[in-house]
Amino acid sequence: MKLIINADDFGFTRAINYGIIDAHNLGVLTSTTLMVTMPAFEHAVDLSKKTPTLGIGLHLNLTLGKPLTNGATLVNEDGELIKPKFTTPEYPYNEEEVYQEFKAQYHRFTEFMKKKPSHLDSHLFSTDIYPVVTSAAKRLAEEIGIPLRNHDTKGFEHVEFMWEKPLEIPYGEYDNLDYIYDNAASILCYDYVEIMTHPGYLDTFILENSTFSTPRANELESLISPRMRQFLNENNVELISYHDIPKK
């Protein structure tokens, strides 16, 4: 089978960036998605240019930090993007404002990276949770000809998306990637699979702005561990990125 191991949150912080690069250079990570609105975005761009074998997509962000556009329905009274804990799936986002924000993020990606992203996905599953956001993201994906990876739109129809929830693992049962070994049969039965990860080193910004902190360091250790490499070799797993996937 062919496996994409993708890291979300490239550009979140310098510590996260270094962790993602180490997970690729020292381990089995093949792909990442870049957040263009976060403080360490340009640092991530610089690192990526020294790491041409790492596939890089765009991590559409509607839930953290400041937007690139002025959409009134996207922000709180402080001008910050609205965090999911203050919304519901029916939150009244304006679809055109969401589309324009995502389009601006795409253009910032291409301006700095000098290429198109390998694929689109979203921070905190916003393109899965909010129907209006899903519609705006699909519109952008169709316009630029780059598939959106989410649970329903099947932008990459060949790829099964794996993490704890689809495998029906109780939240918090694992704080590393050992669920891969424990659920190998449910993962290895497909031809193409993406495993979502969040590797990284920790810093103050992450500890103050992310509910997912210590497990990032644990996932990094898993990705660079001899055990993971041995597991993939023993099961004849071919590591690929989204550049290697047939498009619809």
From Swiss-Prot:
Its EC number is 3.5.1.-. Its cofactor is Mg(2+). It is an enzyme of class 3 (hydrolase). It comes from the Bacteria. Keywords: Carbohydrate metabolism, Hydrolase, Magnesium, Metal-binding. The keyword Hydrolase applies. GO terms for molecular function: deacetylase activity; hydrolase activity, acting on carbon-nitrogen (but not peptide) bonds, in linear amides; metal ion binding. Homodimer. Probably catalyzes the deacetylation of acetylated carbohydrates an important step in the degradation of oligosaccharides. This is Carbohydrate deacetylase 2. It comes from Listeria innocua serovar 6a (strain ATCC BAA-680 / CLIP 11262).
